[in-house]
Amino acid sequence: MDKIAITTGDPNGIGAEITIKALNELDLPQDKIVLISNKDVLDYYGKLDKKYDIIEIPFDKRDIKVGKVTKEAGEFSFQSLLKVCEIKPKAIVTAPVAKNAMYLAGHNFNGQTEVLQKYLAHDNQLAEMLFVANNFRVLLLTRHCALKDVYLTKEIILKKITNLVKTFNNHFNIPNPRFALCGFNPHSGEDGILGREEIDILIPAVKELQALGVDISMPLPADTLFVKAGNHYFKGEKDDYDCYIANYHDQGLIPIKTVAGDKTVNMTIGLDIIRTSPGHGTAFDIAGQNIADPNGMISAIRAVL
């Protein structure tokens, strides 16, 4: 399908509201967009200025429980993702879902990325999380796991960085991207005094990547790296690096969200179809009040135009 498919996320959160606001703001041609949603859910949260195609996901409007985590909402979220995988659109944009709602519905995935990995990946493809705010980009080497369970090997790093190079070549049209690798430990381990992950895992991976022609730094202290990245972002300057490689979730997300806020876009790479999503959650606390800021959704849609 040669359209951008947009899911509206958890029907009890802000997903439908920000989708409606974003599409009305962007004023895109009707033949470019297909919504994976439910007309009753859309009508509950607002009015679209254009009649975009809608692929209906069953949902009883009596099950809309604004701001609540429910099994019915989790099932709707999951079925929306299944449908978008089935139709294989040009690109995918997903509004936020509640992981605990999907768990209540019996779908034990730690996020939308993991669902896409299961139903879209083939031939050993790996879905990766790349966060983007203009030219400030962060790749996560690990995703939704407890900090004590963060697990890295040289082989994992080699595969993820190789996939990242392909994305920069094909999607961003950057033929020779420059990457900065964050150290795993404080001060990049201080020559093994504060941990050996740099010596045993990261540095061997970097040497092998460099031998393949990848422009990637040795492990560098993350705090210093991200201070410089933030300064470049605020000044609108070209960054020293095309992407920063973070070892675990919060190492990468705290800095980019601190400087870019809701304009941060979550991009799934490594599959045949690029998927983007706002860098925020369901915002149950403000759902149904018509006060949700659509800028994150606008950025997510623009990223795949």
Region annotations inferred by a language model:
Residues M1-E114, E155-N247, Q251-V265, L271-I274, ...:
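Contiguous, glycine/small-aliphatic-enriched amphipathic segments in soluble metabolic enzymes
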Residues I33, T113, A127-E128, F136-L139:
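Small-molecule pocket liners
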Residues Y119-F136, I269-D285:
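Short, flexible loop segments at boundaries between secondary-structure elements
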Residues D49, L130-L158:
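Ligand-binding beta-strand-loop-alpha-helix segment within the catalytic cores
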Residues G46, L120-A121, C145, F172:
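A broad structural signal for alpha-helix termini and local helix breaks/kinks
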